């Protein structure tokens, strides 16, 4: 379940991050930790996301969060790169990782399989397209529960 502050945080973070030429990939608020952890994953579409990218976003976002006071009490702000085990959600993700190996989970099973692996060829409103050992496979979006970059 998404924390109710996530949309507000995304609205605050997105213009800051985009001004630096970066993308917001995901925002997670871990309230089960003490103090709670607000993690913002960013990506540099032009090159590898650097420590400097994370530091710049951290400073700028921290100032705005403190100024707006939308965060309840003490919290830890973490800015990071999503890494290789990340899930693909947005159209931008599917474009950026075309040709990469992905794992797709389906429920209910599609063609008697719950797990699919192959090279991502694309996505449209109907299906995610994979290349599995030279064979093209279209997995309907309606049965897909997650698409994740393969290890």
From Swiss-Prot:
InterPro entries listed in its UniProt record: Ribosome_maturation_RimP, RimP_C, RimP_C_sf, RimP_N, RimP_N_sf
Pfam families: DUF150_C (PF17384), RimP_N (PF02576)
Localisation per UniProt entry: Cytoplasm
SUPFAM superfamilies: YhbC-like, C-terminal domain, YhbC-like, N-terminal domain
GO terms classed as biological process: ribosomal small subunit assembly; translation
A cellular-component GO term for this protein: cytosol
First-listed, main subcellular location of the protein, grouped into a coarse class: cytoplasm
Gene3D superfamilies tied to this protein: Ribosome maturation factor RimP, C-terminal domain (2.30.30.180), RimP-like superfamily, N-terminal (3.30.300.70)
Presence of the UniProt keyword Cytoplasm in the record: yes
Keywords, comma-separated and alphabetical: Cytoplasm, Ribosome biogenesis
UniProt function note: Required for maturation of 30S ribosomal subunits.
Sequence similarity: Belongs to the RimP family.
PANTHER family hit by this protein: RIBOSOME MATURATION FACTOR RIMP
UniProt-recorded name of the protein: Ribosome maturation factor RimP
Species in which this protein is naturally found: Crocosphaera subtropica (strain ATCC 51142 / BH68) (Cyanothece sp. (strain ATCC 51142))
Gene that this sequence comes from: rimP
């Amino acid at each position: 379940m998404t924390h109710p502050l996530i949309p507000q945080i995304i609205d605050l973070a997105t213009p800051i991050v985009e001004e630096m030429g970066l993308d917001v990939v995901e925002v997670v608020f871990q309230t089960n930790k003490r103090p709670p952890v607000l993690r913002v994953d960013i990506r540099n579409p032009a090159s590898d996301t650097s420590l400097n990218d994370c530091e710049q976003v951290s400073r700028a976002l921290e100032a705005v969060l403190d100024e707006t006071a939308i965060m309840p009490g003490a919290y830890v702000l973490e800015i990071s790169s999503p890494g290789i085990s990340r899930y693909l959600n947005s159209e931008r993700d599917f474009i950026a990782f075309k040709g990469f190996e992905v794992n797709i989970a389906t429920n209910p099973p599609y063609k008697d399989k719950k797990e699919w692996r192959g090279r991502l060829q694309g996505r449209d409103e109907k299906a995610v397209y994979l290349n599995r050992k030279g064979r093209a496979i279209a997995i309907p979006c309606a049965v897909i529960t997650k698409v994740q970059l393969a290890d």
